[in-house]
């Protein structure tokens, strides 16, 4: 009983961590913005023209994907937390339910963890390009240093959320295959009992 309680608590804490970390990454990305000024050399003009620009997540498709993915992971984690709490209060023997629920959790957790990992990888690549630049992409962090610094926090939260989501997916897969083995063992026991019952008949 104590072991079951510890497993439930660990899974709940991991889901809670994934939810808050992905939500933090989402909010930081969406709310982060900075106004910057940079000069443009125009042919024929004696002096460069000073131009104002605003950096936010809507300027790059990768940032939109990152924000959307973090929102999906946070929403999914909240849904699973609600289901888990309902399962605990109802006195269900397992936080992941029966075979069908275990399959749904397994597929959902694997999808969420891979989506979170993909979003974290995209954010890391964008952070690198913003800092170092590329042949066709200037180092925008030169002009928007505060924006890049704050976005770095979102990248850290995204990777921590990925770690929590992967641990949740590992627990879900372990439970699913363990449940599958238990069900197979129960079926074999029923068959043996049926065979013994048939043999005992005169």
Curated annotation (Swiss-Prot):
Residues 1-10, 86-101, 170-202 are cytoplasmic. The chain crosses the membrane at residues 11-31, 65-85, 102-122, 149-169. This is CASP-like protein 2U7. One of its GO terms (cellular component) is plasma membrane. It comes from the Eukaryota. Its main location: membrane. InterPro entries: CASP/CASPL (IPR006459), CASP_dom (IPR006702). It comes from Selaginella moellendorffii (Spikemoss).
